[in-house]
């Protein structure tokens, strides 16, 4: 028993979830961002000793491209190693300045120049040098990249694994519906090679999907003759020709199966098969038993059979017949005449030995290897004149050289497995013993020595003909054994290699010059192509996405996403149903629930909770070992290919206390089917019930009671929840909340254990435990700076709040501070609301939601959004734009929020249309009248030559300015505001460093004190020899004088010396860091070309919940707020408590998401238990009673050993703190597929003194009358989604117009109008509202003259309109004229 008890950390002791899971946890939830972090770590191999780096990532890419030799071969550039420098700016600075977070890559290369004169290639001279190859983006510890100041995520790609695949066309190609089989060799990079049958059973090949050629052309190009091809693919029957008549067949009985002979088959006198009868398996057994070796057959038996070899007249050398000819009567007579003794024929039949290659040879026009090579050249390069060399080089470069073709380790492994070879390693190119055997370069000799007489291409064709012959099966391309995951590291490596290959071409050109001109490696290598390739990938690849940062869950999910789209993947339009569908191999690897609705459904998936990738990139999932019906805790990860061979039981299979499977038949999965098997046949068992789903789906309680479509919506909508002002843990969770919050990186976790010594809103200081301190310079202090009110990618607010107090003792990994949407280290996306399921005056018709005013008053769903507004001053043709408070034609009142530099104050409350940054732009001189010129000469009025282009608050937005940043171009004088900001920033940094130094110093002195108090001195600091140091003496001594003490004890004097060194080292380090920071702050900023100054203003916008906002539960039960009703009108219970939200009960039955009802029941029980605990606390019950009640809640069910809570670990003080944290409700965990049962929910309700039906009598708040029947009431975790009505409301009177049609633009972003479409026109036509219609189609839309005239008329007070010609009609006329049809308008 005891070993099951977990010890609780400091954070967990604050609040413990009651867990209903029956399954003991075998495997902890793994680090959720591992797929990103591990992949990129392997790519960089940053902290690995250069000599020990493996063939991955940067190292592999550099090794594959270098050495680069010049065309003459007299100079070469070799790769030695690489190292990454330090990033110039840290993550925070990059975000602020809009930079990319990366480190410079420096590669050491060696230029070797050989002596031309010597025959042995003697080295003339060698130069080694470090070359800068651009910036490599670095990954933050949360798995993201910062590109141009924004956080991005590189999504992993699920693509078809390299290797060989066999398939058929499902009868679609030919009208007869005949299945045409095909094979395709897909390399990691290089040309695809296809083999396919046509309806006439000839075999063709295609290279890169071009036009098809008979497959024999490819084999002939490899060097095979007709006879060799036939010998490879067919077994041969030998016939001996009798001189007069008849033929003797060398009998292999098996080969006669299915034939019908025209003569009796006899063994002596005993007839085995009568003439005209079909030969069966029984007959063959008899023949084998009889031991007949030869069979005499008539001539007509051999006629029509296909020759396997050329037949030559031995005496004259005349060719009598060629291989692959069908034997005719005449030829047979000629053989007899020439005295040919024996001929070989191909063993073919219609059943399972098709004559496919023989058919193909008949349509092959080529005769020699050269002709075949030329044919391939013509197909690949139509229109170019072929030469022998060109044809040979082209063919060689297609499949046989590593520069152009790479199967990769995965591809080779898959290839060898599919064609039935034992070994999984081999060459990256296609190997063919005949082809390489005829070449005599070094590489070919090495290959032949290594692989002997195998042939990749022949093996594929053999497997394909076997499949066509009915032996073997085609592959399922949606099987996860045939699709692999390409993660960040691998994609970055490919991009880096592409950049290097571009560099290689340029280097080759220059190397020939290097010999004569003595160039250095730095002059040879131009890093631009590499840097450009990397920048393009991280900045604009389809898989480099703007991180979804609504809340911690959406961040984690985005990083765990697996997409089938992207370069080298599928496209939405072409992806069929099969690719998108759930496949049995998805089990435990890819979530079967979470995928977007819409055009991407099934193409974008999410990794399952426990899934990981193996070394080849295939997804694997963990299973527990089962041996002879006994389940062990040993865990093994299986890929989809390996899993195929095993029988796997479900996680909830019944076992006894010893772990033996108890049922007679266990429900299992085997090869994609579900069946029942006896325990002895089971090999593995699932690790956990939530193995099949992703994190988002695993966060939905009672998922097992929801319909899959709704569960999908629930999982997707949790990612859109906006972090509320105060996060609230879900009363009903699934127990995985803590893991998600921990791995998302939004909380602050302790790096090392220790004691909290100082804390404020922005910083936590930990004095580290002695045993965790490493190294002499480590002062044993950890300082955590918290993130305060910063903007996320989705404009939500990121803010961290400390959870600990001074004096708390914490361990490594404890949560020190909560981030957005976390509550004591648990994910908390919404609020627990009291919900009633009942109709309420139609206000909850069609999923509408009725809210109580109390929800708004208590700010339960108030969220803070941070908007970033940017004002840019550019250099224009007419002169520079200027940021200033001196703006023409603007009232004083409009400028009252600006300082003298023209920038808004921090703390100003602004509304739509207010000026935030004053800016004027010079405008072109208009022609002035002499009077104006005179006036301007007299009054010197300058206002007329600039126009106001200030940054104003956009419509529909109001808020408080929380931060202003001013960026100034290098070499331009900073204005007063910029200098102010700079000074305050330097002050802040200085104070920060001073504080940090003070804390470190105090910690060092404190450690020193413990090491020297009570020790004897030799003198110094006013002490005599033999005195003992006391605490009181040290208190009276200046800190600097401590180091003057001379100790008797060796250790103590060493401690003093060490402390002094530490303080000096830290002081130096802080000075250096401060100087570095200061330099960065005061330096000019790197702005885009033409930009002189940039001001960023950050607005905090408070959004309360209001009608029109979208809300949802976790079960796909979404809706829009329809009304906010005063508290006194809401339904209330007998106790007087009013409900917060009223939902429509009709939303449940048809949608089949019953999970929400169970959640409401259990939530109510959780809240009731909290109230009982509160009542006990208020009554000051004895701690023992409280302990007993908590034990009753957590450990009532003795059978559920898996999740007992050991309350004996808690001291009385800790228990009281736990109880205080539970007064708001006892949080419950019901893990997916292993959740609370109906009986358990009822027991909890009873324990909380609530009706076990989960229903209660409600009263109408307006009349006070009781409703007719009892209502389901309880607590549900309800979310506010990031679809807020404030972001969608939009109106326009005048605004921008489209350039060509002159019609108003559309959409809020463009400040567009509302489209008056076809159907709306019909509606006005139907009403006969001709004038309204004319106005809509002309002056309100695209009649330019009419628009302007209308404007003038309104200004003049005349309300009349003159409709003219709509511009779009003019466009139509012009388009018709462009088709050379003249169309003119006549006045009627």
From Swiss-Prot:
GO molecular function list: DNA binding; DNA-directed RNA polymerase activity; ribonucleoside binding
InterPro entries assigned to the protein according to its UniProt record, in alphabetical order: DNA-dir_RNA_pol_bsu_external_1, DNA-dir_RNA_pol_su2, DNA-dir_RNAP_su2_dom, DNA-dir_RNAP_su2_hyb_sf, RNA_pol_bsu_bac, RNA_pol_bsu_CS, RNA_pol_bsu_protrusion, RNA_pol_Rpb2_2
Major enzyme class: transferase
UniProt GO BP: DNA-templated transcription
The protein's Enzyme Commission number: 2.7.7.6
Protein role: DNA-dependent RNA polymerase catalyzes the transcription of DNA into RNA using the four ribonucleoside triphosphates as substrates.
Assembly description: The RNAP catalytic core consists of 2 alpha, 1 beta, 1 beta' and 1 omega subunit. When a sigma factor is associated with the core the holoenzyme is formed, which can initiate transcription.
PANTHER family: DNA-DIRECTED RNA POLYMERASE I SUBUNIT 2 (PTHR20856)
Family: Belongs to the RNA polymerase beta chain family.
Protein name, UniProt field: DNA-directed RNA polymerase subunit beta
Organism: Stenotrophomonas maltophilia (strain K279a)
């Amino acid at each position: 028993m005891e070993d099951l008890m977990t010890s609780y950390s400091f954070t967990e002791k604050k609040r413990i979830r009651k867990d209903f899971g029956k399954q003991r946890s075998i495997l902890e939830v793994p680090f959720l961002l591992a797929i990103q972090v591990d992949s990129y770590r392997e790519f960089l191999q940053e902290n690995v000793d250069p000599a020990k780096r493996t063939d991955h990532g940067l190292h592999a890419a550099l090794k594959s491209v270098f050495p680069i030799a010049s065309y003459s071969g007299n100079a070469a550039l070799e790769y030695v190693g690489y190292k990454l420098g330090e990033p110039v700016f840290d993550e925070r600075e990059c975000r602020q300045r809009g930079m990319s977070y990366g480190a410079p890559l420096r590669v050491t290369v060696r230029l070797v120049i050989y002596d031309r004169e010597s025959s042995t290639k003697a080295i003339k001279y060698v130069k080694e040098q470090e070359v800068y190859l651009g910036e490599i983006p670095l990954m933050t510890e949360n798995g993201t990249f910062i590109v141009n100041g924004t956080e991005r995520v590189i999504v992993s790609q699920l693509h078809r694994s390299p290797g060989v695949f066999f398939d058929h066309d499902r009868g679609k190609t030919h009208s007869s519906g005949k299945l045409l089989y095909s094979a395709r060799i897909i390399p990691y990079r290089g040309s695809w090679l296809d083999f396919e049958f046509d309806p006439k059973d000839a075999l063709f090949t295609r290279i890169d999907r071009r036009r098809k050629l008979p497959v024999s052309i490819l084999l002939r190009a490899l060097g095979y003759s007709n006879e060799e091809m036939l010998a490879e693919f067919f077994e041969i029957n030998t016939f001996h020709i009798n001189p007069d008549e008849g033929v003797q067949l060398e009998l292999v009985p098996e080969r006669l199966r299915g034939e019908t002979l025209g003569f009796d088959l006899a063994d002596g006198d005993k007839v085995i098969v009568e003439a005209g009868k079909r030969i069966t398996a029984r007959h063959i057994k008899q023949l084998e038993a009889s031991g007949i070796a030869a069979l005499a057959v008539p001539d007509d038996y051999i006629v029509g059979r296909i020759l396997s070899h050329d037949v030559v007249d031995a005496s004259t050398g005349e060719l009598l017949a060629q291989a692959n000819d069908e034997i005719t009567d005449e030829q047979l007579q000629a053989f007899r005449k020439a005295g040919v003794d024996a001929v070989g024929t191909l063993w073919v039949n219609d059943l399972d030995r098709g004559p496919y290659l023989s058919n193909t040879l008949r349509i092959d026009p080529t005769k020699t290897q050269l002709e075949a090579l030329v044919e391939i050249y013509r197909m690949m390069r139509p229109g170019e004149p072929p030469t022998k060399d060109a044809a040979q080089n082209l063919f060689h470069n297609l499949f046989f050289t590593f520069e152009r073709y790479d199967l990769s380790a995965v591809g080779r492994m898959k290839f060898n497995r599919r064609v039935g070879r034992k070994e999984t390693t081999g060459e990256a190119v296609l190997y063919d013993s005949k082809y390489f055997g005829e070449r005599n370069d070094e590489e070919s000799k090495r290959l032949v020595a290594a692989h002997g007489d195998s042939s990749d291409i022949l093996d594929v064709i053999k497997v394909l003909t076997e499949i066509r012959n009915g032996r073997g099966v085609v592959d399922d391309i949606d099987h996860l054994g045939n699709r692999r995951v390409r993660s960040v590291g691998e994609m970055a490596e490919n991009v880096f290699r592409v950049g290097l290959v571009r560099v290689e071409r340029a280097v080759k050109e220059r190397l020939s010059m290097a010999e004569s001109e003595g160039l250095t490696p730095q002059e040879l290598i131009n890093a631009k192509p590499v840097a450009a390739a990397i920048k393009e990938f991280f900045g604009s690849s389809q898989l480099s996405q703007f991180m979804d940062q609504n809340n911690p869950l959406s961040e984690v999910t985005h990083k765990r996403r697996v997409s089938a789209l992207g370069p080298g993947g599928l496209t939405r339009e072409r992806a069929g149903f099969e690719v998108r569908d759930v496949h049995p191999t998805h089990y435990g690897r890819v979530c079967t629930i979470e995928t977007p609705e819409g055009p991407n459904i099934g193409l974008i998936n999410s990794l399952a909770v426990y899934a990981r990738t193996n070394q080849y990139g295939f997804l694997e999932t963990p299973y527990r070992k089962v041996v002879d019906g006994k389940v062990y805790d040993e865990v093994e990860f299986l890929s989809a290919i390996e899993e195929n061979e095993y029988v796997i039981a479900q996680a909830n299979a019944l076992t006894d206390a010893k772990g033996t499977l108890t049922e007679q038949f266990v429900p299992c999965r085997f090869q994609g089917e579900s069946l029942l098997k006896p325990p002895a046949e089971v090999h593995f068992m699932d690790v956990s019930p939530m193995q099949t789903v992703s994190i988002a789906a695993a966060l939905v309680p009672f998922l097992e009671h929801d319909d899959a479509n709704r569960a999908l919506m629930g999982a997707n909508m949790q990612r859109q929840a906006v972090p509320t002002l105060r996060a609230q843990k879900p009363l009903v969770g699934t127990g995985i909340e803590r893991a998600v919050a921990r791995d998302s990186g939004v909380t602050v976790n302790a790096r090392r254990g220790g004691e909290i010594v100082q804390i404020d809103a922005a910083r936590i200081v930990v004095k580290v435990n002695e045993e965790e301190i490493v190294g002499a310079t480590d002062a044993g202090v950890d300082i955590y700076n918290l993130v305060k009110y910063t903007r996320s990618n989705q404009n939500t607010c990121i803010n961290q709040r400390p959870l600990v107090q001074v004096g708390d003792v914490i361990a490594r990994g404890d949560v020190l501070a909560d981030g957005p949407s976390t509550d004591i280290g648990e994910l908390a996306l919404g609020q627990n609301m009291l919900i009633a399921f009942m109709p309420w005056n139609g206000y909850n018709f069609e999923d509408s939601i009725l809210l109580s005013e109390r929800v708004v008053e208590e700010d339960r769903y108030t969220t803070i959004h941070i908007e970033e507004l940017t004002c840019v001053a550019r250099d224009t043709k007419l002169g520079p734009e200027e940021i200033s408070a001196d703006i023409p034609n603007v009232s004083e009142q409009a400028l009252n929020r600006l300082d003298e530099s023209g920038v808004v104050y921090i703390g100003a409350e602004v509304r739509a249309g207010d000026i935030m940054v004053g800016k004027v732009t010079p405008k072109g001189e208009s022609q002035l009248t002499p009077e104006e010129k005179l006036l301007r000469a007299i009054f010197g009025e300058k206002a007329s030559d600039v126009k106001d282009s200030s940054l104003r608050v956009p419509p529909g937005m109001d808020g408080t300015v929380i931060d202003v940043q001013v960026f100034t171009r290098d070499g331009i004088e900073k204005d007063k505001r910029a200098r102010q900001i700079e000074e305050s920033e330097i002050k802040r940094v200085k104070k920060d460093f001073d504080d940090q130094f003070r804390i470190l110093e105090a910690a060092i002195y404190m450690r020193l004190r413990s090491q020297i108090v009570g020790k004897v001195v030799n003198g110094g600091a006013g002490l005599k020899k033999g005195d003992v140091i006391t605490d009181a003496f040290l208190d009276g001594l200046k800190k600097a004088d401590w180091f003057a003490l001379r100790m008797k004890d060796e250790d103590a004097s060493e401690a003093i010396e060490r402390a002094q060194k530490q303080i000096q080292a830290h002081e130096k380090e802080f000075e250096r860091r401060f100087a570095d920071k200061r330099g960065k702050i005061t330096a000019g900023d790197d702005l885009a070309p033409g930009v002189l100054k940039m001001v960023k203003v950050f607005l905090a916008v408070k959004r309360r919940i209001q009608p029109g906002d979208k809300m949802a539960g976790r079960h796909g039960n979404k809706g829009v707020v329809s009304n906010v009703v005063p508290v006194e009108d809401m339904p209330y219970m007998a106790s007087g408590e009013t409900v917060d939200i009223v939902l429509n009960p009709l939303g449940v039955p048809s949608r089949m998401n019953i999970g929400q009802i169970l959640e409401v029941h259990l939530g109510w029980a959780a809240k009731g238990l909290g109230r009982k605990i509160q009542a006990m606390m208020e009554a000051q019950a004895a701690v023992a009673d409280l302990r007993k009640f908590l034990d009753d809640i957590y450990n009532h069910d003795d059978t559920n050993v898996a999740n007992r809570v050991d309350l004996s670990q808690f001291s009385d003080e800790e228990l009281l703190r736990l109880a205080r944290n539970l007064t708001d409700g006892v949080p419950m965990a019901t893990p997916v597929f292993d959740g609370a049962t109906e009986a358990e929910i009822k027991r909890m309700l009873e324990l909380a003194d609530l009706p076990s039906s989960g229903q209660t009598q409600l009263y109408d708040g307006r009349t006070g009358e009781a409703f007719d029947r009892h209502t389901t009431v309880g607590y549900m975790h309800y979310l506010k989604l990031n679809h807020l009505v404030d972001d969608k409301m939009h109106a326009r009177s005048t605004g921008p117009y489209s350039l060509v049609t002159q019609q108003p633009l559309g959409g809020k972003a463009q400040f567009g109008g509302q489209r008056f479409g076809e159907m709306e026109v019909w509606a006005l036509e139907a009403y006969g509202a001709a004038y309204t219609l004319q106005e809509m189609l002309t002056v309100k839309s695209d009649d330019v003259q009419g628009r302007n005239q209308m404007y003038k008329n309104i200004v003049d007070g005349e309300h009349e309109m003159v409709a003219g010609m709509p511009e779009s009609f003019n466009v139509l006329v012009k388009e018709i004229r462009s088709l050379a049809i003249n169309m003119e308008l006549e006045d009627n």
